[in-house]
Each structure stands twice: as structure tokens, then as C-alpha cells.
């Protein structure tokens, strides 16, 4: 998935790196000053640059498609220390960045709405609901259906947290009409190790890329099982980490049935 897509979609490298970036040392506060610099898979490479306060300045992802390749650039914009929007472009040298997303906040300082843009017009938005601990409880997706003129909500995700601060279950819900009841489409179960997820110390990483368990949980995901509600076979994935001498993850091995993907990371 491309960083330039709406709905907060991100490249496969960034998504896989979301697991790897969650090493047990803070990516932004290490005594060695370590910051994640690059993430590579066999088909993609993402380079992350930072502002002086160690917030993300830019994500540049290069995708290889056979003999072709293309680039996605995501640029966060901050005001008074708050993330207010992100810009997107395929080529900073030849194409000016355009508005990709904007963020609205509630009275408690939580991001409650993420709007997505196409040609400077809102093409969809997410409405976010938090529990009394400030944890994301639900995410409602709004789009304008074909042939209609107003936004409707046909899909949502519900999150269950454990006492350690990890999302242990995500329920994917759908409905045919905006006024119909939601029905369960699939359930995703997560298991974790006991290592600290340093990704949460990278300011706004989840909102810049995507809101999911790996971006929000306190520990590192080691297994993920997707169970369809229609009784179809479940899909299981596992994640294993290798660390360098400074205790940073330098490799993540993702296994899905007989497939294996290796993600390599470099630090600065």
C-alpha cells in the first residue's frame, strides 16, 4: 500500500517497520541518541528524517515494481507542537506537496477527526472515540458512496485493551446502509512479548502512518491471527526480532503460512 493513498494507508515497509521500531529502547530518548533512519524490504525502502525536537519531518518511501520504481513522500506539519496536517508528493523537486490529511482535536487534546483529501477536497474522514483511559476505543470510517452527495459510515474498528496497555483484539465491523446495525466481519487477535514498544515515543507516528495495534500498544506484537466471521480459515502471522549490539532491532522476520518477509533497519 502506498503512502500517497488516503485512509492513512502506508507502504509495506513502514507497516513492517512498525513492528521493528518497537525495540525495548526508546527510539527518541536513547542515551546513544539512536533514531530509526531506514527500513528496507526486498521491494521497498523508507527513509525517515527528523526535526530538531525529534518529531518526524519526512517519510520518503521508494517502491520497486518490476523494472519500475516510484516514490511517496509524506511531510507532517506542526503548529504549537501539535500535528495539524500532512502533505504528500511523488517528487519534491518537480511536484509541490499537496494536502493529504488534517487533524481535529477534542477538549482533552486527543485527535478526534482525521480528514483525507483529494485535490484539496475532503474525500473521507475518520471519527475517533477514546475510553476513559485515553485509549482508542473505536475508529469510524466515513466516505461518500457512489451516486450520493453526503458522507456515510459503513465500516468501523473496535479495540479491546489489556491491563498492560496492549490492544489484544480488533473487531472489524461493517454494514450495508448508514442506518443499519453493524455486523462483525472479522476479528484480529494479538499476542505480545514483554519488551517496551519504543515506537510510542516517536511523536504522532501512528497518526502520520496508520492507527493500528502495533503503533498504539505498550509491547511488541509477536503473533497476529485474523479470524473471519463467516467461518473461513483464520490467517496467522508471526514476528521475530533480531537486535544489534546497541540493542536496537536490525531485522524483523515476518512469517505467514509458507511465506517469509525480512525487513532490515538502520539507525543513526
PLM regions with names:
Residues 25-268:
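Buried hydrophobic residues that stabilize the cores of well-folded domains
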Residues 1-32:
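Bacterial Sec-dependent N-terminal signal peptides
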Amino acid at each position: 500500500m502506498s503512502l500517497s493513498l488516503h485512509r492513512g494507508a502506508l507502504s509495506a515497509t513502514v507497516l513492517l517497520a512498525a513492528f521493528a521500531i518497537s525495540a525495548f529502547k526508546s527510539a527518541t530518548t536513547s542515551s546513544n541518541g539512536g533514531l530509526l533512519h531506514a527500513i528496507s524490504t526486498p521491494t521497498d525502502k523508507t527513509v525517515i528524517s527528523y526535526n530538531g525536537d525529534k518529531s518526524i519531518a519526512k517519510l520518503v518511501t521508494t517502491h520497486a515494481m518490476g523494472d519500475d520504481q516510484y516514490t511517496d513522500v509524506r511531510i507532517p506539519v506542526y503548529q504549537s507542537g501539535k500535528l495539524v496536517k500532512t502533505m504528500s508528493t511523488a517528487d519534491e523537486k518537480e511536484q509541490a506537496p499537496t494536502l493529504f490529511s488534517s487533524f481535529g482535536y477534542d477538549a482533552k487534546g486527543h485527535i478526534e477527526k482525521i480528514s483525507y483529501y483529494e485535490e484539496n477536497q475532503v474525500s473521507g474522514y475518520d471519527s475517533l472515540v477514546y475510553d476513559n483511559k485515553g485509549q482508542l476505543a473505536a475508529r469510524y470510517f466515513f466516505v461518500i458512496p457512489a451516486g450520493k452527495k453526503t458522507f456515510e459510515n459503513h465500516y468501523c474498528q473496535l479495540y479491546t485493551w489489556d491491563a498492560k496497555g496492549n490492544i489484544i483484539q480488533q473487531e472489524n465491523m461493517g454494514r450495508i446502509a448508514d442506518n443499519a446495525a453493524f455486523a462483525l466481519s472479522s476479528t484480529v487477535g494479538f499476542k505480545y512479548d514483554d519488551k517496551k514498544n519504543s515506537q510510542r515515543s516517536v511523536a504522532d507516528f501512528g497518526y502520520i502512518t496508520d492507527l493500528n495495534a502495533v503503533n498504539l500498544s505498550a509491547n511488541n506484537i509477536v503473533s497476529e491471527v485474523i479470524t473471519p466471521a463467516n467461518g473461513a480459515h483464520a490467517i496467522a502471522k508471526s514476528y521475530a526480532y533480531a537486535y544489534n549490539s546497541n540493542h536496537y532491532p536490525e531485522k524483523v522476520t515476518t512469517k505467514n503460512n509458507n511465506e517469509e518477509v525480512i525487513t532490515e533497519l538502520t539507525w543513526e
